[in-house]
From Swiss-Prot:
EC nos: 1.2.1.70
Catalysed transformations (reactions): (S)-4-amino-5-oxopentanoate + tRNA(Glu) + NADP(+) = L-glutamyl-tRNA(Glu) + NADPH + H(+)
UniProt KW keywords: NADP, Oxidoreductase, Porphyrin biosynthesis
Name assigned to this protein: Glutamyl-tRNA reductase
Gene Ontology molecular function: any one: NADP binding
Stretches assigned to coiled coil: none
Organism this protein belongs to: Campylobacter jejuni subsp. jejuni serotype O:2 (strain ATCC 700819 / NCTC 11168)
GO biological process: protoporphyrinogen IX biosynthetic process from glutamate
Length: 432
């Protein structure tokens, strides 16, 4: 069954989420390797963003305690706290949750579009490292289709916003950004989004990054209202400007009290990274806003999009039902093939017996074979048609199990590709 263990902004604070975050692929790979050794876990992947850590799996039976215990040991967190906080979804609930995540209905900022890329990256990593097979491939592929439907059939992503844009919106509430210089730390996706929104608000931006070439490339994309420098010069900039937006992948805080000088004017720090980049004391001239502090702005966004969200959840509900109908349909075709294969094997076997016992001349073998197969074909025609008519209907699962039992088909099914996936897992370009 499909299985999901979820830690998000809804059930955990940022301090716990940053401990759980997978800031590098090595840690993610280590965790997936650990949990994939469990006898009940067949496939698994991890989605890790600033607002969530999701463990999505295909399992033989529930195994939340093992997964959570493994996560707790790796991240040095109390297992009991995690078990208490975790939201656990099974089977249709897990698929509905995955579709909601992919469609940005479960995001801190409803309608933000970054999550689709983050899910794609998580899936690609799991496929590349052999943690993800056909079951999760189908689920994720269907999640992308669902997300596309939500985007196309609702206005949920119209004028789409992100955590970065919410941070800039909060900055605009605090001061007029026109012609001001704002420092963006980090040249990744979140940093680029923050820079674009700052420029749109009339500000000029300075990009600081450890990799100077990446900072330069970003500035070239942004245009004339930007400049760049090395992260090594961070202290100089921290004590020269008013607005700072930090979005790096650093495992520990990069802006600390030792870098901050006392100044006479007000400075605003927006920490949009998880784990957090900023660990400084606030005072009358220093204000720090982390991801969770932007909740009020987010709630305004949620109210505006509430009607669209209701429509989107309707789509997700229908797509969840359709997904399980699709799985039942996949199971029907091998049943039909197996019955026909079984009939052919019995016919060929009885034909050989008849030849050995002299009931049939060798010269008549082919004609007899054709006749027997025609009889079986005619006999199986109506059952085959009726089975095909069951496709997409709720009772198909019951009939499938009955047919397996009546015809003793379990062994026959093992040789068939009953789990054919609709896209090539080796081709990452086909994932999204």
């Amino acid at each position: 069954m499909y299985y999901c263990i979820s830690f998000t902004h809804k059930n955990t604070d940022i301090a716990l989420r940053e401990k759980l975050s997978f800031s590098n692929e090595a840690k993610k790979g280590e965790f997936l390797k650990i949990i994939s050794t469990h006898e009940n876990i067949e496939e698994c992947l991890v989605i890790s963003t600033c607002n969530r850590v999701e463990i999505v799996a295909f399992v033989k039976m529930a195994c939340a305690e093992f997964i959570v215990k493994s996560l707790a040991l790796l991240c040095d967190v109390d297992k009991d706290i995690l078990l208490e906080k975790a939201d656990i979804f099974e089977d249709s609930g897990a698929i509905h949750h995955l579709f909601s995540v992919a469609s940005s209905l479960d995001s801190l900022v409803v309608g933000e579009t970054q999550i689709a890329g983050q899910l794609k990256d998580a899936f690609a990593f799991a496929v590349k490292n052999n943690f993800c097979g056909v079951h999760l491939s189908r689920a994720v592929h269907s999640a992308f289709k669902c997300a596309a439907k939500v985007r196309n059939e609702t206005q949920i992503s119209k004028n789409s916003i992100s955590v970065a844009s919410v941070a800039v919106a909060k900055a605009k509430e605090l001061a007029d950004l026109t012609q001001k210089k704002a420092v963006v730390i980090g040249a990744g996706e979140m940093g680029e989004l923050a820079a674009k929104h700052l420029i749109a608000a009339g500000a000029k931006v300075i990009i600081l990054n450890r990799d100077l070439q990446k900072a330069k490339d970003l500035c070239e994309r942004l245009g004339v209202l930007s400049e760049y420098d090395s992260l090594e010069n961070l202290k100089k900039y921290l004590n020269q400007y008013e607005f700072f937006f930090s979005a790096t992948n650093a495992p520990n805080a990069i802006i600390t009290n030792s870098l901050i000088e006392e100044l006479s004017y007000k400075r605003y720090f927006f920490d949009i990274a998880v784990p957090r980049d900023i660990d400084i004391n606030e005072n009358e001239n220093i204000s720090v806003f982390a991801v969770d502090d932007l909740e009020i702005v987010v709630q305004k966004n949620l109210a505006l999009r509430e009607q669209e969200a209701r429509m989107a959840y309707g789509i997700i509900g229908r797509e969840t039902s359709e997904f399980f109908r699709y799985l039942n349909d996949l199971a029907l075709m091998p049943i039909i093939k197996a019955i026909r294969l079984q009939a052919k094997e019995y016919a060929d076997k009885q034909l050989e017996i008849a030849l050995k016992k002299g009931y049939l001349k060798k010269s008549d073998k082919e004609e007899a074979r054709k006749l027997i197969h025609q009889v079986f074909k005619a006999f199986l025609h109506t059952p085959t048609v009726n089975l095909k008519h069951l496709q997409g209907k709720m009772q198909s699962d019951t009939v499938i199990n009955a047919m397996r039992y009546v015809f003793d088909l379990q062994n026959n099914l093992e040789g068939l590709n009953q789990y054919k996936c609709e896209f090539d897992m080796e081709n990452n370009d086909e994932i999204y």
